[in-house]
Amino acid sequence: MRSVLTISVGLLFGLALSSVAHANDHKILGVIAMPRNETNDLTLKIPVCRIVKRIQLTADHGDIELSGASVYFKTARSASQSLNVPSSIKEGQTTGWININSDNDNKRCVSKITFSGHTVNSSDMARLKVIGDD
């Protein structure tokens, strides 16, 4: 009886750990160096086809001003979606989650994310870290 109880407790503990591991599926998709002059072709390519439901942006070094962002999906027609991003992100600040790929019936792989923007208030280039949640 004791061995059955031990096995049951072990299985429950294992299930609890596996559900915690899946609950936080956040991955750093990449980092973009933001130039000091306004640039509209900053591209973060996703080398492996990845379904991403939402992203967060972090200003790792320096302040950033953004004027736009788009996500591109790996499809026959290279579909894209404009994203609502904040106009400025201060150093060390992380945005809230920005939803993408909201069509749950048609799971599309993200191939790249493009940004328009630049570094402000710094002589060094700011770094924009992109975190994805699938």
Swiss-Prot record:
It comes from the Bacteria. Keywords: Signal. InterPro entries: UPF0412_YaaI. It holds the Pfam family DUF2541. Residues 1-23 form the signal peptide. Belongs to the UPF0412 family. This is UPF0412 protein YaaI. It comes from Salmonella typhimurium (strain LT2 / SGSC1412 / ATCC 700720).
